[in-house]
């Protein structure tokens, strides 16, 4: 996906970390959105579908 912005890598006191990725978009009534996360600790990528009421 193009035009994705990433935050700096941020660490918590326990050394866990997070990274925010975002992109501007204009949703329509029929669009469906999902986020896919790949990580070495996951056996397969995790896909989360975003609900309309979020």
Swiss-Prot record:
Residues of the Ig-like C1-type domain: 3-41
Primary location class: secreted
GO cellular component, one term: MHC class I protein complex
Keywords: Immunity, Immunoglobulin domain, MHC I, Secreted
Disulfide bond positions: none
InterPro entries: Ig-like_dom_sf, Ig-like_fold, Ig/MHC_CS, Ig_C1-set
Pfam families linked: C1-set (PF07654)
Gene3D superfamilies: Immunoglobulins
GO biological process: antigen processing and presentation of peptide antigen via MHC class I
Localization terms from the record: Secreted
Domain of life: Eukaryota
Function: Component of the class I major histocompatibility complex (MHC). Involved in the presentation of peptide antigens to the immune system.
Family according to the record: Belongs to the beta-2-microglobulin family.
Description of how the protein assembles with itself and partners: Heterodimer of an alpha chain and a beta chain. Beta-2-microglobulin is the beta-chain of major histocompatibility complex class I molecules.
Protein name: Beta-2-microglobulin
């Amino acid at each position: 996906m193009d035009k994705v912005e990433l935050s700096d890598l941020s660490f918590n006191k326990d050394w866990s970390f997070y990274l925010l990725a975002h992109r501007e978009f204009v949703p329509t009534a029929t669009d469906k959105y999902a986020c896919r996360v790949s990580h070495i600790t996951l056996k397969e990528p995790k896909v989360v579908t975003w609900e309309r009421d979020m």
